[in-house]
Amino acid sequence: MADESPAVWVRVEALDTVFHEAAQALAGRLGLPFGGEARFALQLGEQGLQLAELGAQAPGPVRVDFVEGASAHRRLFGGGSGQMIAKAVGVQPGVRPRVLDATAGLGRDAFVLACLGCEVTLIERQPPIAALLEDGLARAVRDPEVAPIVARMRLLPGDAIARMRQWPDEPPQVIYLDPMFPHRDKSALVKKEMRLFRPLVGDDPDAPALLEAALALASHRVVVKRPRKAPSVAGPRPGYSLEGKSSRYDIYARQSLKG
């Protein structure tokens, strides 16, 4: 976790006067300042909500977009149920497990699973990032092709460990974890996002507690995404792993998923 509150780092601002009132309301809801000195800004404008680092050498802003860009490409050409993430969570003919993504981030993996037909609940504990997700989902609902997919996605703000320990509903069949890790994918897009997010989010020293809570709740399996050469999260050893070029999925199976 970051050492300081996100409120120290982030302000909310409108990119046009027409969004002034909505941006002020968002700032109030998130408990963030509207304007003033900050390192980052949640900016509300014509294209929705975006997070930007402020300053002359800053990279471009980041938005959640499930309709165009990388998400659209993966939806159309990503490989369907042959993708490693699909195999990791147990997607197979006649089986589309109910998944809890307890470290949702920008929602990319959750969107892939929803594209495959899974019902996915997302938890994101950092309010600025949860706000980006909420905005991306709201815009996606307006697209006729993507709306049926995001209808399978439900966002819950708050702390995932606390929510899992007090889960009020039927347990998810699969819980998916992707804890922040110091060494990640070195692509330009991920580098930009990490530059934006790491000061807010930090690493995840509570990953063992996340895993413990997930193992206590999931009815069928827990899946932990890791960099390929990273150690497993401290705690019980995974039953097996699926390894790709840059990532690895550690799988803690409790019972078989059946159609």
UniProtKB/Swiss-Prot annotation:
Q: Catalytic activity annotated for this protein?
A: guanosine(1516) in 16S rRNA + S-adenosyl-L-methionine = N(2)-methylguanosine(1516) in 16S rRNA + S-adenosyl-L-homocysteine + H(+)
Q: What EC number(s) is this enzyme filed under?
A: 2.1.1.242
Q: Which domain of life is it from?
A: Bacteria
The UniProt keywords, alphabetically, are:
Cytoplasm, Methyltransferase, rRNA processing, S-adenosyl-L-methionine, Transferase
**What does this protein's UniProt record list under function?**
Specifically methylates the guanosine in position 1516 of 16S rRNA.
Extract the Pfam families matched here: SAM_MT
The record lists S-adenosyl-L-methionine as bound by R108, D109, E124, R125, D178
CDD domains (alphabetical): AdoMet_MTases
Output this protein's name: Ribosomal RNA small subunit methyltransferase J
Give yes or no: UniProt keyword Transferase.
yes
Q: Does the keyword Magnesium apply?
A: no
> What Gene Ontology terms describe what this protein does at the molecular function level?
rRNA (guanine-N2-)-methyltransferase activity
One Gene Ontology CC term in the entry: cytoplasm
Which family does the entry's similarity section mention? Belongs to the methyltransferase superfamily. RsmJ family.
According to its UniProt record, where is this protein located? Cytoplasm
